[in-house]
Amino acid sequence: MTYSICYIVPPHILREIAKKGNNSQRAWALQTLTISEQFRGRREVVSLMPTVFAVAGEKRRTVYDAKSGYVLPGTLVRGEGDPSTGDVAVDEAYDGLGATYDLYKSVFDRNSIDDRGMRLDSTVHYGANYDNAFWNGSQMVFGDGDGEIFQRFTKSIDVI
């Protein structure tokens, strides 16, 4: 099975920001592009990783915190049934993963996104001012944005 790395903000948009943004915007856009290129090279490795499945019909969400670093998945900060953490990005990711599971269950009668009970994992606070979010074949990863052009990527259910 081959997995693709799917980004929310496409590379051509980041290249335009790198060309036309102010100094800090250009720096963050170039940093995001560089990290994105590194992940494209890891695509094959991710596809070889085992997928963890939940018991049929059970919602199972896990949210990790990269703490502005680049190591995935990061530190586990919230699992299925755990109370709200008070970290807005963590709680938005958790709630968004739940809405995603519920959508697939109620509209498509699927057991998670793959119909085989796939655990829904995500990592928040990825990178320093990382201007993107992506699916790496096994989890969603959310940057917090630079605060000028992009805000945290957990704010929009369309991203999650």
Residue ranges and their predicted role:
Residues 1-159:
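Zymogen propeptides/activation segments of proteases
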